[in-house]
C-alpha cells in the first residue's frame, strides 16, 4: 500500500466465497451490475464499516444461493439505507403520505417528494423485510418499477452527488 498513489492494486487475493449461480444467470447478473453501480456511487465517500461490508457480503451470498427474485435489489437498497443513516422513520406509518425528502410519514402533503396511495402501500410492504421474506412479496411489474424509481429518488435526496444510475435501463429490459 502506498498512500501517495490514487490507484492501488492487489498483488494477491483469495476469495472467501466462490459464486456459483450469479455468473450463469443473466437476470442475476443484471441485478448485480445495477447494485455494483449504485454501490460505487455510495461507497466512495464511506469510512471503514465492517457491518456494512458484512451486510453486502451476506446479501451477495444469499442471492447466489437462492433462485432469482425480482425484488432482491429493491429490498437490498432499502436495507442498505440503514447503514448509510437514512433508513425511513417507520413511526407513524399509518399516515397517508411518506415524505421522501425528509424520510418520515405525515398526514400533511407539504413536500414535492411525497408518495401515497398504491406507491405508499408498496413502499410499506418492503420496510422491515429481510431476504428470507422475499418470497412473500408480490408486486406487479408496474408497482416494482414505481417502487424502484421512488427508492432511487430517495437515495438522490439523501446522498450528495448521487447521479442517475445508467444500468437501470438495462435492468428494466431484463424483467
Per-range role (PLM):
Residues 1-175:
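Non-catalytic alpha-helical scaffolds and adjoining flexible linkers that form interface surfaces
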